[in-house]
């Protein structure tokens, strides 16, 4: 090994970057349980204090993927993940979860990777479970769902068993670490297209460049101004787009797409059951701000998936998927398929 954990810690304390092979070696020690909890905690805090670089995050993500239980999808046409880092503190209903069924209703193949709530009132796994989805699927069963239904959900604990070495340390620390931003970068189906929400504007450019380093085909990394890890109806959304190997950053606004603005707090929920009700209302065609924000995010998903030529045309397709009943049908078929395993 080119560096010891103690040397890596010292380097971070001095605000010096770890090289790719060094970060790779450190992450392998962490994920395998070979590094002591004290050193893991120290290194995580030192990395956070100096601010993790694009190279360090990319190396860490690659190691997490090495240790993950992968999902083998044969037909990868229009395969896309729609995911958020969480941690935005907005406590909204599960916008991206609703958007996945709308996008699937238009022909996207969704390989969604998510977990239970950490800081929100309802994580993607929580609301899917409330909707009747069986989370305890094997990797092969998830792959079959994606190929037959066009929708698959990879419950993070089922695919990242090595995280058991890190979870107790993260809980004890109680602060954000690099692991808060690694989850969305470690899709077990290796989807090359992604709509990713982040909890801080600084992460938009960083995560877009990490995705670039990881060889993604097309990605939108978004931060809703005012604090939302989705594309917002409350005002501008900062976007980092990776396309054709190039990253560019810009802002979009709901009015760009003919949508009315709505404050983020109008989407707040107290628990997964409340989130479930809004998701079902949207998929059943109830008009209003909740439907608008889902169509906005589904439209962006369809753009990234390569089905729509723009976010605007994606929104139009998303609205049709709802009014035709295709989006609700995707949910119902997905629930039945997961329960029949």
UniProtKB/Swiss-Prot annotation:
Which cellular component, as a GO term, is one annotated location?
cytosol
Catalytic activity as recorded in UniProt: N-(5-phospho-beta-D-ribosyl)anthranilate + diphosphate = 5-phospho-alpha-D-ribose 1-diphosphate + anthranilate
For 5-phospho-alpha-D-ribose 1-diphosphate, which residues are the binding ones? 84, 87-88, 92, 94-97, 112-120, 124
InterPro entries, per database record: Anthranilate_Pribosyl_Tfrase, Glycosyl_Trfase_fam3, Glycosyl_Trfase_fam3_N_dom, Glycosyl_Trfase_fam3_N_dom_sf, Nuc_phospho_transferase
Which residues are anthranilate 1-binding? Answer: 84, 115
EC number(s) stated in the UniProt entry for this protein: 2.4.2.18
Residue sites binding Mg(2+) 1 per the record: 96, 230
Chain residues that bind anthranilate 2: 170
Name the record gives this protein: Anthranilate phosphoribosyltransferase
Q: Which organism is it from?
A: Polynucleobacter necessarius subsp. necessarius (strain STIR1)
Q: What is the lineage of its organism?
A: Bacteria, Pseudomonadati, Pseudomonadota, Betaproteobacteria, Burkholderiales
Q: Which gene encodes it?
A: trpD
């Amino acid at each position: 090994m080119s560096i010891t954990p103690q040397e890596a810690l010292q380097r971070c304390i001095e605000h010096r970057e770890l090289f790719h092979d060094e970060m790779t070696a450190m992450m392998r020690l962490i994920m395998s349980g070979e590094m002591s909890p004290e050193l893991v905690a120290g290194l995580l805090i030192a990395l956070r204090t100096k601010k993790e670089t694009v190279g360090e995050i990319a190396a860490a993500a690659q190691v997490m993927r090495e240790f993950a239980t992968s999902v083998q999808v044969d037909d990868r046409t229009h395969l896309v993940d729609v995911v958020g880092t969480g941690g935005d503190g907005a406590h909204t209903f599960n916008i991206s979860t609703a958007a996945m069924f709308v996008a699937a209703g238009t022909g996207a193949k969704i390989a969604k990777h998510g977990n239970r709530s950490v800081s929100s009132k309802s994580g993607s796994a929580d609301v899917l479970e409330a909707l009747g989805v069986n989370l305890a699927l094997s990797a092969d069963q998830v792959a079959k769902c994606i190929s037959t239904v066009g929708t698959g959900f990879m419950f993070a604990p089922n695919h990242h068993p090595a995280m058991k070495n890190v979870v107790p340390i993260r809980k004890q620390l109680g602060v954000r670490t690099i692991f808060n931003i690694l989850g969305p970068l470690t899709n077990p189906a290796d989807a090359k297209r992604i709509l990713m929400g982040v909890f801080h504007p600084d992460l938009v450019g960083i995560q877009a460049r990490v995705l670039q380093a990881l060889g993604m085909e097309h990605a939108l990394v978004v931060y809703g101004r005012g604090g939302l890890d989705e594309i917002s109806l409350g005002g501008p959304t900062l976007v980092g787009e990776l396309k054709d190997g190039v990253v560019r950053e810009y802002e979009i606004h709901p009015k760009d797409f003919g949508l009315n603005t709505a404050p983020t707090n109008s989407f707040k929920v107290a628990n997964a059951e409340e989130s479930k009700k809004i998701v079902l209302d949207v998929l059943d065609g109830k008009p209003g701000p909740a439907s608008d924000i889902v169509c906005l995010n589904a439209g962006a998903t369809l753009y990234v998936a390569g089905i729509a030529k723009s976010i605007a045309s994606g929104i139009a397709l998303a609205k049709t998927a709802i009014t035709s009943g295709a989006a609700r049908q995707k949910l119902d078929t997905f629930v039945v398929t997961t329960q029949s395993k």
